[in-house]
Amino acid sequence: MAITAQMVKELREKTGAGMMDCKKALEENGGSLEKAVDWLRQKGLSKAAKKAGRATSEGVIGNYIHSTGKIAVLVEVKCETDFVARNEKFQEFAKNVAMQIAANNPAAVDAESVDPAIIEREREVYRQKAREEGKPENIIEKIVEGGIKKFYKEICLLEQPYIRDDKMTIRDLLNDVIATLGENVTIGRFVRMQLGAEEA
């Protein structure tokens, strides 16, 4: 497959990697944008991968209040410098993350912050269901892992499809912001309140 300038541009915008690295990634992966993104991440060439370890001590508290006034969200979005914290794109990202939380009500930012006991309970539910359906033991673990991946997409903010573009996840959106702004950005704590909802 011929690699076009448009494909290289799209990959570069998505990852922030250099033009030649993007071209090589596309060539190595038969023109597949998705595989090229993974290839760049594995090689550590995407800006998000390079910036992941840098401290984020500045930022904003993004907020969203639904037009009905019955749902509100506060989310901590952190970056490295106050210059970026004041950037319009950064603030728009914080607002979009707050809207995502309002719409999808995630339980955690990422898989690492989910209580392991909850994950183990979910695994057991998937195991039992597979056994009841008479699935062979050798494929039950694959079924369980598939179920857990789906579970993460429901409860983990970074794994959820973005409400404004379901072809990308919040993690993809975060990586785009990192590439665009040129510094590490992280999503910290969040709180979602809904009028009349029971506290968990």
From Swiss-Prot:
Family of this protein: Belongs to the EF-Ts family.
Cross-referenced CDD domains: UBA_EF-Ts
UniProt KW Acetylation keyword: no
Name recorded for this polypeptide: Elongation factor Ts
Main location: cytoplasm
InterPro entries xref list: EF-Ts_dimer_sf, Transl_elong_EFTs/EF1B, Transl_elong_EFTs/EF1B_dimer, Transl_elong_Ts_CS, UBA-like_sf
Region (Involved in Mg(2+) ion dislocation from EF-Tu): 81-84
Subcellular location: Cytoplasm
Function: Associates with the EF-Tu.GDP complex and induces the exchange of GDP to GTP. It remains bound to the aminoacyl-tRNA.EF-Tu.GTP complex up to the GTP hydrolysis stage on the ribosome.
Gene Ontology terms: cellular component: cytoplasm
GO MF annotations in UniProt: translation elongation factor activity
PROSITE patterns membership: EF_TS_1 (PS01126), EF_TS_2 (PS01127)
Annotated organism of origin: Nitratidesulfovibrio vulgaris (strain DSM 19637 / Miyazaki F)
Keywords associated with the record: Cytoplasm, Elongation factor, Protein biosynthesis
